[in-house]
Amino acid sequence: MMQASLWSLVTTSVRPTCVKRIVPGLTAAQQRRYASTIEADLVVIGGGPGGYVASIKGAQLGMKTVCIEKGETLGGTCLNVGCIPSKSLLNSSHYYHLAHAGELKKFGILVDNVKLDLERVMEQKRNTVKALTGGIASLYKKNKVEWVKGHGKITSPNQVNALGPDGSVISTINTKNIIIATGSEVTPFPGLEFDEKQIISSTGCLSLSQVPKKFIVIGAGVIGLELGSVWQRLGAEVTAIEFLPTIGGVGIDGEVSQMIQKMLVKDSWNFKLGTKVTTARKQGNDIIVSVENVKDPSKKEELTCDALLVCVGRRPYTTNLGLEDLGIERDEKGRIPVNNRFQTVVPSIYAIGDCIHGPMLAHKAEDEGVITVEGIAGGAVHIDYNCVPSVIYLHPEVGWVGKSEEDLKKEGIEYKIGKFPYLANSRAKTNAETEGFVKILADKNTDKILGVHMICSCAGELINEAVLAMEYGASAEDVARTCHAHPTFAEAFKEANLAAYFGKPINF
């Protein structure tokens, strides 16, 4: 009887990912699995931004596509424990800050006895994540992408095994091409172990059960500044410790970095720049963090907090993929070398996203996923990394694309600057959001836009206009002569380009 029901399961499944013999009294881990074999045109290892987009694009181009993802939900770090939940918390904390700090009074809105319901804040975050990850699963069904839940391990140039938690083979997929889109993971800090309650990673920081009184952030890059802002707005006293002499991470323009630091200091942030963390230890309910000056190690200090966030970067997740057996080496940072078509040294195996060179950004991975699949289908493969934007979701937001002044000086490129402050922008005035500016860097001889940097409440949206202009090789004059709706924040972008081309803007 059991055998009959088993074969019934096999014959009624169009493409089973595994067949399991159910034996009463045994746990799920003890049940015997029978690996299936699947034939495919494309296997994508990883269901994050790069992987899920590549999977859908492959299916849309007529490829029989299988995505191997070990998580309980699709979307990778970005949707589950990164971009999306952090933006939800940033949004909620911003609203709380406006009400609690009395910022609404100037608009004639009086709010008394403002209280924080942290559990409801977290519920909003969870609901957002659930909706978006579920949306990807629906897109997979719509586009006929098969999701095999497991850890992908490449066994040959045209074969991948999906492994279960115990290392057993769930499915074997034979395929024409393979895309590695395994993303990245939190870089550990030597000597510190995450308990995700007091000593926390970016993942644990998204789910704290109470607001810390004193909150120390190791690393004042994009992630550290954003997550620090969440808890600072909710009432924590925040201190950021940064090894470098500036904040904001790699690629940020020096002038922009200085201005956002001033804004954060005004919001009661404390900064320890050019400072190295030597040790951190628990003492009762507190954490004692020992630091020293980078240039003068004799200058030492001890700081106390009740929560310590470690944000010292991320590293590619490229272990246990079977790369070594195929002759695919990784560089000193664990990244997979690829050519300009995103092929590894094995022509049928490609890699995209955080596990290769370039900034670890979801939108960069998405673009690479699309063009890699188009290349496999015979199309052209091109991406201009100078046109990949970056955003820090503070308030006001920070956005940039292309070269910074420091880059241009280092490369010996002659340039001109056009700037326009939001203090002189009509929409910024109406919204009482006048902090910030737009800065254009254009070639001194050709007027071609080389870089755009901005600080404003909607920089994350507005920077995309700059990306479009640069992608099509626009000059400052091109943008300056393009009509912009009034009153809008985007007018500042036009005015800054006027300043770059004509030497001065109209409204300042």
Show where each model-derived region lies.
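Short hydrophobic core segments
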Residues: 43-45, 152, 172-183, 217-218, ...
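Beta1/beta-strand and adjacent pyrophosphate-binding region of the FAD-binding site
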Residues: 36-50, 211-221
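Residues that mark the start of a beta-strand
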Residues: 41, 62-64, 213-214, 348, ...
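Glycine-rich flavin
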Residues: 6, 15-19, 23, 38-40, ...
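FAD-site-proximal beta/loop scaffold in flavoenzymes
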Residues: 195-211, 302-376, 461, 469
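Gly/Ala-rich phosphate-binding loop of Rossmann-like dinucleotide-binding domains
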Residues: 55, 59, 228, 232-233
